[in-house]
Each structure stands twice: as C-alpha cells, then as structure tokens.
Amino acid sequence: MAEELTQTTQSITPSTGVVLLAFGKPQYYWATYNLVFSIRKHNPNVRITVLFEDTGKALSHCPEIVDYVENIGIIDAEDIYTNKKLDPGKVKINLYKYLPYDCNLYLDVDAIALKDIQPMIDELAQSGKQYISHCVGYHTIDKGRDFKEMQWAWADKMWAHFNLLESYVMPAINSSMQWIVKGSQTEAIYRTAKDLYFNNPIPIKELRMKWGGGQPDELYMNVALAIHGIDPALKTYTRNDGSEGGMIHFSMQRGLSFEKIVQNYYLQSYYGGAGFTPRFYIDWLDRMLNADFKAIGKRHIYLISRIAENKYADGKR
C-alpha cells in the first residue's frame, strides 16, 4: 500500500527543470558549459536539459557539458535553419514542443548563475502563472507608434498588420528568460505565435530593427500575449536598473556594484552582440569562474571575454 501511495504522489508532482538551447557557433556550446557549471556549482540538484543541434558537434566543441546536465535532446534541423541559414528566432518560436518538464525555466545560455537558482524557480512556481518572461514595458495603440521598450516594429504597423483590437495591451518581453508551465494556456500562446511567425510575418524589410536577416521571436510572442490577454510579468517585482528585480541582471552600462548584483539577482547576463555588455561585468564573470574552477582543480578554459567577442551580430549569422 505504501508503495502504491508513493507512486501516486510522484505521478502528480510536476517535474521542474532548466531548459537550454545550444546550436551554431562553438562559442554557444562554451557558454552553455559555463552556465550549467555555474548552476550546478551552487546547487547540484537542479535538473538541466540541453537541446543540441547535433550531439556529436556539441561534444566536439565542448565534451565537458555532459558532466553537468541531466538530459540531452536534439533540435530538428528544420527548426534551426531557414534557406540553409541559422535562424535563432525560429528555434525559440518552436520551443514549446521541446519542453521536457511540466514546469520549465528556459534561459538563454549567455548568462552565469551567481547563486542557487532554486529560490528563483520556487518563486516562479508559486506565482501560479503558466507563462512568465522578463517584461520591460507595455503599450497600447493610443500611446502612439513608438513603443519605446519594443524595438522590433512600430506599434501602428503591428496593430494594422495583425488586425489587433484597440483595447489590446501589448507587453515587451526579453525572451532570454521564460517560465513555461505546459498546459492549455501556454500551448495556445505558442500556437498563435507560430501561426503569426510562419503564416503572417511582417516582412523583414519593414521591421523597425533587423536581427541577422531573420525574424525575432519576441515580436510574435508579444503579439500572441496581447491577443490572449496574458501579462507575462511577475507582478511582485518592479523595474529596477532596467530589469525586473531579483531574477537576471541585464546591463548595457556600468551601474550596480558586484555586491549589489549578487544580492539582488540570481544570474548575470551578457546578452547582445559584441561590446553590448560592459567589459567591467565580463571580466568579473571570468574572475569568478576562474576561482570556481580552480577550487575543484580545473581550469577556466572557455573565457566569457572570448565568447562575448564572437557572438552573433545583428547583421551576420
């Protein structure tokens, strides 16, 4: 009887873990390794799944990744490339079908964990929301065409192109972090975003900002969230230094001290193209990783400074 009860309890306990995508340049596999190492350094029990373009390719670039992940999955080639060109937005717009857990914390790999992320996961789970992302602003069409927090397209273009209601409130997300609980709501969000992305995209030449010749996933996720009336923000937070406090620190200029960042955030991002994140923070991350690897008798091989210098720029992939 006890065994049957245990099995029943396990079956209704939602699985929860971190999901990462690693494809393209070798630097993204190196970044993945640094991130999973930093997560597991602070908490070896956090579940991590990495989705690769090709396992052989990934392990040829960075064989050490397997030491720190629970599961490895493969992304279909048709979800990675468009006309034989790498298409990161396409991968992320197809993310839902690859989610391995009931509750998934998706992270872009260009970040480093500063402390145990389990309290972050717990807070996201306790919110009761099925979808949360890093939300930097909102817009309604009565505010005009300039949606300052959303760089991909002009507001009037989006409202006209997608035939949006005047009453819609559109969020602006940074999809570097997404909390996705599998269910009818999130499935509908991604279904709508995919339909817009593949069947009714804004022509690339008409975008406000170009992104390497491909379509940005955030644009279509923003529209889908507006259509479904979903607020992706974790409401307990307020804007703080350009970020929602307590999760991931994003910065284009030197601001908070290292101590304040560790105190207030779980991860430090180095997103964007080369030179986007200040070298001040890049060097700090390398110093931390160097000390952490040295403490276990290893070398910090994959320097953040080198990874950041060789990331995808807006014009090329």
Where are the language model's segments positioned?
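GT-A fold catalytic core of metal-dependent nucleotide-sugar glycosyltransferases
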Residues: K90-R145
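Active-site-proximal specificity loops/subdomain of glycosyltransferases
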Residues: K57-L99
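A glycosyltransferase accessory/donor-loop signature
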Residues: A2-T16, V50, W159-R317
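A conserved hydrophobic helix/loop-capping motif in glycosyltransferases and polysaccharide synthases
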Residues: V18-K25
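Conserved glycosyltransferase catalytic-site signature
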Residues: Y29-T32, G89, I93, S175, ...
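Short loop segments at secondary-structure junctions
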Residues: T55, L99-Y101, V181-Q185
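Short internal beta-strands
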Residues: I48-D54
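Short, acidic, metal-binding catalytic loop of nucleotide-sugar glycosyltransferases
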Residues: S38-V46
